[in-house]
């Protein structure tokens, strides 16, 4: 855990942290509704796994991610996921071929919401020594996800609890999730409505020994 913590902190400190602030141990916070761009990078090799627009309903725990057409270094369809965390299912949607897969989600944890049990580590400023109005006050949180046996370090803004970046690692994967162009509202709530061709799709059986979760889904794209 110490090696993981050092690696995660090093990443963000290198991004421009200029002054540590006194930490008062803030309570676990909840993300607002959001629309933005999510980029997923595999730190081993620096491969961009996916980048695209998302909508997140923080009240009903629904996430829609649609991969950008600019991410063309792949042979399969662009990823389009609707994740219903409260229901424990997600849909892999292919709008081009009007096909859909419905599968189980085995964990509620994801990169756009602090997982339960996240422990506050430090409060700091990111920005410039000379241009104070450009500084962003942020919190760093760390923890583990029991269902996935993974560890994470998350960077959120103070106040709104906007997730800026999440570093996630297991024995087999190491991913960095970056959140940008964030607007604190769901601009298109219809994104959470299933396409008609998905409505009658049966839940697929999960292969023995396999666990579907937000992090693993993006690792396999």
Curated annotation (Swiss-Prot):
Q: Which family does it belong to?
A: Belongs to the ependymin family.
In which tissues has expression of this protein been reported?
A: EPDs are synthesized in the meninx and secreted in the cerebrospinal fluid.
Post-translational events: Binds calcium through the terminal sialic acids.
Would you say which domain of life the source belongs to? Eukaryota
Q: Does the keyword Transcription apply?
A: no
Q: List the disulfide bonds.
A: none
The listed locations are: Secreted
Q: What is this protein called?
A: Ependymin-2
Select a single GO molecular function from the record's annotations and give it.
calcium ion binding
- Principal subcellular localization: secreted
